[in-house]
Design a protein with these regions (language model features):
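Non-catalytic C-terminal accessory modules of carbohydrate-active enzymes
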Residues: 145-146, 153, 231-389
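Hydrophobic core segments within long, regular secondary-structure runs in both alpha-
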Residues: 6-9, 13-16, 26-40, 122, ...
Length: 389
């Protein structure tokens, strides 16, 4: 799938941020460049897998599996755009598992220039520019940096409905799917003037995606600080929820689809159903590295009205342990232990005007930013924080 090839850059970057080790980036550097698929671009930078640009050289450069040759039953197989799974198949016969199912793409209108694919492409270019700079390939750095800017401009010029401010599924389409809007939100593509419109649209759509798509949906929601809606969706008990798996289907393992009615032949052990594991750690408790190898960690809890929460989080520098007591809009307290050789940047929810923060009983300076108060350069060791007015 085209999507998976582009996601390799995201995986490589996450590995670097969590370990601080450049050896993998260095070893696979040329492979990573090819997996941006920048050679499939037209003049405006947007890429397509359907316009005859996918050559054998490109397939070989990204190491297309031999399995795909037999799977596609073609002499010259090509990439296929996923968006989400399963897809609707109007040509499926009655014996096929795809017969009669709606699919999980939110009626995505597949076009040559695909908004989902080009959103991934944009992010792959951004990451490749960072990797090039880290490794000292400055010509590549400027190429990928400039190409990313071009692609972002083209997406916003050619793939937005002017009146609604929403993204269409692809060039020539009039349909706006959930997927075509949550990926631009996740990757920071959306113009500021359209942000509220896109977020409102996403909230109206609910869980109109598979467990695979849910990962990206939650990333987008928490990146845009939509913690109330994010928690509502995460704890839903409808037929598109993790609670449905546990309480209704009796699952003890993450599944491929929300229910058999959405994919009759779903398997019972699919890793892509495990989004809550990282969403809770990285977004609700808010632990993310902002300097490679956790030299600096951001702690940005977005727990909304959860009363209490605890987490132990292993990093390459040691374990971060934290616990929170929360009375939404009234009280917030955090105990945290930061490992040696790590510095923290901690975000606290803004519950009051003229709010202040105490660390170990002493008032400390902070920076206010929209819905948060931020304290930087917190060193290692056990700390207690309270907000007050």
């Amino acid at each position: 799938w085209t999507d998976y090839i582009l996601q390799v850059l995201i995986i490589a970057w996450e590995d670097y941020m969590h370990t601080g080790d450049v050896s993998s980036l260095n070893y696979f550097y040329n492979d990573l460049k090819e997996k941006t698929l920048h050679k499939l671009a037209r003049k405006d930078g947007l890429i397509s897998t359907k316009t005859g640009l996918v050559t054998k050289e490109i397939l070989n450069a990204v190491h297309l599996s031999e399995i795909e040759y037999s799977r596609q039953k073609k002499e010259n197989p090509t990439f296929r755009d996923l968006v989400d799974w399963p897809q609707k198949n109007l040509n499926a016969n009655k014996e096929s598992w795809q017969y009669g199912i709606k699919g999980e793409t939110d009626d995505f209108d597949f076009r040559n220039i695909n908004t989902v694919i080009n959103s991934y492409h944009y992010q792959s270019l951004v990451i490749m520019s960072k990797i090039s700079k880290i490794l000292g390939y400055l010509d590549d750095y400027y190429f990928f940096k400039n190409r990313a800017s071009k692609v972002k401009n083209s997406i916003n010029k050619k793939l937005i409905k002017p009146k609604s401010g929403l993204y269409i599924d692809g060039e020539g389409s009039i349909h706006s799917s959930l997927h075509a809007n949550f990926l631009p939100l996740k990757f920071g593509i959306i113009p500021k003037k359209n942000l509220e419109k896109v977020i409102a649209f996403i909230k109206k759509k609910g869980m109109s995606c598979s467990p695979y798509g849910a990962q990206h949906l939650f990333d987008a929601l928490y990146k845009s600080e939509q913690s109330e809606y994010g928690l509502k969706l995460l704890t839903s008990k409808g037929d598109r929820s993790w609670a449905h798996w546990i309480y209704d289907l009796g699952a003890t393992m993450t599944l491929e689809a929300w229910d058999f009615k959405f994919k009759p032949n779903m398997d019972w052990n699919h890793a892509w159903g495990s989004a809550p594991g990282n969403i809770i750690a990285n977004h609700i408790m808010g632990i993310q590295p902002i300097k490679p190898g956790f030299e600096i960690v951001r702690i940005k809890p977005q727990i909304f009205d959860i009363k209490s929460a605890k987490l132990n989080y292993s990093t390459i520098r040691g374990e971060i342990s934290m616990s929170i007591i929360n009375d939404y809009k009234n009280f917030f307290s955090m105990d945290i232990n930061i490992p040696s050789n790590m510095e923290a940047e901690i975000y606290f929810p803004k519950y009051f005007n003229d709010q202040k923060i105490k660390m170990n009983g002493k008032t400390i300076d902070h920076v206010e930013k929209e819905n948060f108060l931020i304290v930087k350069k917190i060193g290692s060791g056990q700390k207690n924080f309270n907000i007050f007015r």
